[in-house]
Amino acid sequence: TIPDALAEVREAIDFCRYYAARAREDMQPVELPGPTGERNVLRYEGRGVWAAIAPWNFPLAIFLGQVAAALVTGNTVVAKPAPQTPDIARYSIDLARKAGIPAGAIQIVAGGGDIGQVLLGDRRVVGTVFTGSVPTAKAIARNLLADDDRPLVPLIAETGGLNAMFVDSTALSEQVVRDVVISGFQSAGQRCSALRLLLLQEEIAEHTIEMLVGAMKELVVGDPANPANDIGPVIDQAAYDRLMAYRQKVADRIVFEVPVPIDGLYVPPTLVRMDSLDDLNTEWFGPIVHVATWPAGK
């Protein structure tokens, strides 16, 4: 939606400012003790060419954060945006060059996983930063270790997980509901920080779920270009099919789902009751929040 997009622009600016500030402080020469009277100075230098592999769900903020971190530490970057969002990356690099970043310091390669494999297999790449799924991160790690004659290549990987919220009887229900709706359903739940599992103390569970369902009834699903809408579509057909198949699988445990009045890749924001945490063994990257209860004192 438009608010999500504006928030991402602000986050991208924050990333650039943060790494610029860290560079001013951390990249300064450090004078070391000289026990025999000599002057010793520690200076940091860039390693060389870094490969930056960015996700589609924050195609501006995370992409620029990866690039900025590499540049301010004296490196050059070959950046591969997600195949779903190459234009956003290209526009952002155009802006970076207009702002004064040397054209040769950043290059973009577009494509899917096959392009990523070629990039990571190039011995000129001395470091890799990646944001995405755990299986892909493991595949990248194996790729970087496949060449026995290649020096070890650092890998910085930010991957997925199951974000949980524990709520006990001291919590303010209104605040809980607000946070669940924002974290679980904003950006159609397509954030690595999105809430996946809501754990409620049994004594307050019924009341909290009732309030949450009431808040979900106020959500409007539709065209993200319309500021009156709260929830937009998921990224592509594959994501839509995967999420809808899962919803069908747990249909008997759906507590509430937001109506979707239009056609398209719109997954209904959904609240699913869970009997066992063992039933949730993977991250469902969409507007689906699972709820379970726990007894006081445990």
Identify the meaning behind each predicted range.
Residues 283-286:
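C-terminal lobe/hinge of AMP-binding adenylation domains
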Residues 10, 83-86, 206, 210, ...:
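Alpha-helix N-cap/helix-start motif at coil-to-helix transitions, marked by capping-box chemistry
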Residues 95-102, 121-123, 127, 134-277, ...:
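ALDH superfamily catalytic-core signature
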Residues 6, 10-177:
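Rossmann-like NAD(P) dinucleotide-binding subdomain of oxidoreductase/dehydrogenase enzymes
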Residues 1, 31-36, 226-231:
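Short linear capping/connector segments at secondary-structure termini
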Residues 39, 47, 268-270, 288-291:
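Short glycine-rich loop/turn motifs
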Residues 1-2, 203:
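N-terminal alpha-helical segment of soluble enzymes
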